[in-house]
Amino acid sequence: MYIEITIDLKNYQQDSFDIRLSNYYSVKKLIDIVWQAKNMTEQPRQGAWIRVVNKQKIIQGTERLLDAGIRTGDRIEIL
């Protein structure tokens, strides 16, 4: 299933943006897709951690978005 989420890149001095992708991707793959979409030169921090802002939940890079409970409308901050 596809989900639509907001990605917050404030930790990397970038604006937030909306993206639509499969919830079967891992958090690490989500970060890879974001880096490609935004053509970012700065490397992501080690561990591929994210925070679901509206659920106050921190998730590691190996979890799938589906298993982590990420749904359409969530706001994701890449740590």
What are these model-derived regions, one by one?
Residues 1-5:
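Short structural boundary motif marking the start of a folded domain
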Residues 6-8, 20, 49-53:
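Short, acidic/hydrophobic/Gly-rich beta-strand patch recurrent on exposed beta strands
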Residues 10-29:
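Short, contiguous acidic and Ser/Thr-rich linear segments
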Residues 12-14, 45-66:
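Short acidic beta-strand-loop surface patches of small beta-rich interaction domains
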Residues 29-47, 56:
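Short beta-strand/loop turn elements enriched in aromatics
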Residues 73-76:
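Loop/turn positions that initiate beta-strands
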